[in-house]
Amino acid sequence: MLGEVSKILAKSSMAIAFTGAGISAESGIPTFRGKDGLWRKYRAEELATPEAFKRDPKLVWEFYKWRIKKILEAKPNPAHIALAELEKMGIIKAVITQNVDDLHREAGSKNVIELHGNIFRVKCTSCSYREYLKESDRIGWLLSQELPRCPKCGSLLRPDVVWFGEALPEKELTTAFSLAKKADVVLVVGTSGVVYPAAYIPYIVKESGGIVVEINIEPSAITPIADFFLRGKAGEVLPKLVEEIRRISK
């Protein structure tokens, strides 16, 4: 099956990747779901909401600083690196991700569409101010005891991520859906396929005549529509795909 998928990817003209928390879990980042996930340690659905931030911004920022610290301790794994490699080879045209950890870019992927925002970006709760935290600023920023405030208007800054009950960023969602309509193959990597509207992406590819390839450690909500299901860790399966594509493309 791996050989067949490799041939399909090698011949494809418009392949995309759609990634979820599973790919980051292999880098040691706790997920919101699953037995080792954040759900057990914190009731994340109570913290990652606009209402929680209004009620107790300090608590929400403590939670996010803890998440940022976990992400800073993580490094891109072989799956992230393999996807960046597939982009360099001209096979993957974009990585659409539900993750907020920036690991795809760190691995070398250039065209990354972040549907749920970026944990290293902050935005003002009142005006249009946004800021991406440079690597050199991150540690000092984490150590600060003060609640971050907007340099333009003085209002509180919040993480530029999509919270429960919030709409996805329109520009990113439109771009993702447009790519899905044009894609001839989608690699669905490490996603449960239950968070909408992001989870529509494999369905759009399928409905537009494309091939759905799922890579996951266990079946998901996407599995029934997958043309190929490659069971295993993304960090093991994706590098093998890269290797096989290189071999058959010689």
UniProtKB/Swiss-Prot annotation:
Annotated positions binding Zn(2+): 124, 127, 150, 153
UniProt EC number: 2.3.1.286
Source taxon at top rank: Archaea
Residues annotated for substrate binding in this entry: 64, 67
SUPFAM superfamilies tied to this protein: DHS-like NAD/FAD-binding domain (SSF52467)
General function of this protein: NAD-dependent lysine deacetylase and desuccinylase that specifically removes acetyl and succinyl groups on target proteins. Modulates the activities of several proteins which are inactive in their acylated form. Deacetylates the N-terminal lysine residue of Alba, the major archaeal chromatin protein and that, in turn, increases Alba's DNA binding affinity, thereby repressing transcription.
Protein name according to UniProt: NAD-dependent protein deacylase
Organism (species): Pyrococcus furiosus (strain ATCC 43587 / DSM 3638 / JCM 8422 / Vc1)
